[in-house]
Amino acid sequence: MSTLGLPPAVFLMGPTASGKTALAVSLRSRFPFEIISVDSALVYRGMDVGTAKPDAATLARAPHHLLDIREPNETYSAAAFCDDARARMAAITARGRVPLLVGGTMLYFRALLQGLDDLPRADAALRKRLEQDAAERGWPALHAELAALDPATAARLAPNDSQRIGRALEIVELTGRPMSAQLAQTPRALPYDVLQLALVPSDRAALHRRIGERFDAMLEAGLVDEVEMLRRNHVLDSTMPAMRAVGYRQAWAYLDGDIDLEALREQGVAATRQLAKRQLTWLRSWPGAVTLDCLADDLESRAAALVAAHLGA
């Protein structure tokens, strides 16, 4: 127990390609951690290459909770994540171990800390109307509409992020209040003493190089083949949340003949950079986070020292 009388937990947050998984596996080898994935794409079965899902050898050494828990034609929400994560955190703590939550889906981290109790459930009729509106005007037009109603939320979303734009507009219409204002409330605090580590690069150009190299490695490892297999084995369309993930939507467009391989690579890298930028925007204003340079040679030792102090190890 901490000095607060609460069990300890650690958040390891960071943008894509910042080395979160490698650091988490290293920390797990030194401390009594169990890893919980905080990633809206890693929940899907069969989506391995394009999500940089840890390979079998890594998972044998360091198992991860909340991987491969949904089919790619299913949805997964922040509310579902909170339920799943809280249940696993409680079980891990009961085993005398410490939850280490690792990922880059910042909304999930925030929802876990602050709760989503006041947000309404999805409204099928309203969502259908929004989707019909988007089909006529395009999601960027709805993003602009959201910017007028909830600028804080719109600033964090890409203009074509149909799932999240739709949800944010839905919340405004159902409650009369922007989602950002409701997320600022704390209806149910997380009952843990949480050390929050944020991986932020000192050199954005270096992170961009990593992103490009990683996307090239995904293409080499068979990203297009993976998406082709998913299309063959599941009833999918390009608007489903799983297929809106970075890399997957570009591969889908390639398989549809809308873009060539060069454009797939160019658009995929650009979209990944944009994702990293949004993640860093969250992290730079994240209250209570301890920032670590993900490019530093002493990253592991600095992170380990902070964890040791937090756990009293």
Curated annotation (Swiss-Prot):
SUPFAM superfamilies: P-loop containing nucleoside triphosphate hydrolases. Its cofactor is Mg(2+). The record marks 105, 127 as: Interaction with substrate tRNA. It is an enzyme of class 2 (transferase). The keyword Iron does not apply. Keywords: ATP-binding, Magnesium, Nucleotide-binding, Transferase, tRNA processing. ATP binds at residues 14-21. Transmembrane segments: none annotated. One of its GO terms (molecular function) is ATP binding. Pfam families: IPPT. InterPro entries: Dimethylallyltransferase, IPT, P-loop_NTPase. Residues 39-42, 163-167 are annotated as: Interaction with substrate tRNA. It comes from the Bacteria. Its EC number is 2.5.1.75. It catalyses: adenosine(37) in tRNA + dimethylallyl diphosphate = N(6)-dimethylallyladenosine(37) in tRNA + diphosphate. GO terms for biological process: tRNA modification. Substrate binds at residues 16-21. Catalyzes the transfer of a dimethylallyl group onto the adenine at position 37 in tRNAs that read codons beginning with uridine, leading to the formation of N6-(dimethylallyl)adenosine (i(6)A). NCBIfam families: miaA (TIGR00174). Monomer. Belongs to the IPP transferase family. This is tRNA dimethylallyltransferase. It comes from Thiobacillus denitrificans (strain ATCC 25259 / T1).
